[in-house]
Amino acid sequence: MTSTINPETLSGERIEELQQIAGDHMFMHAAQTNDWRGKLKVYTKGEGVWVETADGHRYLDAMAGLWYKSAGYGRTEIADAVYAQMTAIDSSPSGGATVPQVELAGKVAELYPDKGARSFFVSGGSEAVETAVKMAKKYSILNGKAGAFKVISRRYSYHGGTAMAVSLGGNAAADPMGPLMPGAIHVTNWNSYRLPYAGDPIDVAIKCANEFEEVIKHQGADTV
């Protein structure tokens, strides 16, 4: 059973026990096990932008988790709303929808310039990226471009941890895995500080746009 009530601090012995269990039985996202084995930070509390570890240290979480915690930690009003909905009905059977789902779709449409906007709700960023790519491919098929399977993205970008999302990232760390998604094409990442032709941001943007256009021409516009 997972504990849902975190104490302010844990004993040193308990922290070491948790670190040992984690080292033996967990993989951490975007981290090498040997880098944190035996010294893993065990968090017990979060409030706003602050998090606290089991040994009493307090840290500013400037990354918002892994860019997903923009609402902050310890938001009781969010927890209360989630609890209320989960005790009523937490999801809908296939082919149906809950009241909050429908209301949220309507709210998104109100905020979006295109009032005919539709929402497809998913569980996280990686799934959102993969769904967007599949929708784009389906749109191409329905509009007579059945051969448009290639997706152009920027090198050294991050789109998620699933196979398709990793393919789009264009990071060298994924190269040993071999080809993941056919048709994943990469262009220069717009970063005026690190590019070999670094300089004025406007000039860099124009060069990147020109490269993007050339890649489309080279690959064939009907395939992108």
Outline where the language-model segments fall.
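Active-site-adjacent loop/helix segments that line or gate small-molecule/cofactor pockets in enzymes
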Residues: 2-47, 86, 208
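Glycine-rich, flexible loop/turn motifs
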Residues: 32, 39, 67, 74, ...
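Active-site and channel-lining beta-strand-loop segments
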Residues: 40-61
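Short beta-strand-to-turn element immediately C-terminal to the catalytic PLP-Schiff-base lysine
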Residues: 52, 73, 165-169
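PLP-dependent aspartate aminotransferase-fold enzymes
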Residues: 106-223
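Short secondary-structure junctions and interdomain/linker hinges
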Residues: 25-33, 89, 115, 219-223
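Glycine-rich loop-to-alpha-helix module at the N-terminal edge of alpha/beta enzyme cores
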Residues: 4-8, 12-15, 58-145, 152, ...
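A generic alpha-helix structural signal
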Residues: 19-23, 79-83, 105, 209, ...
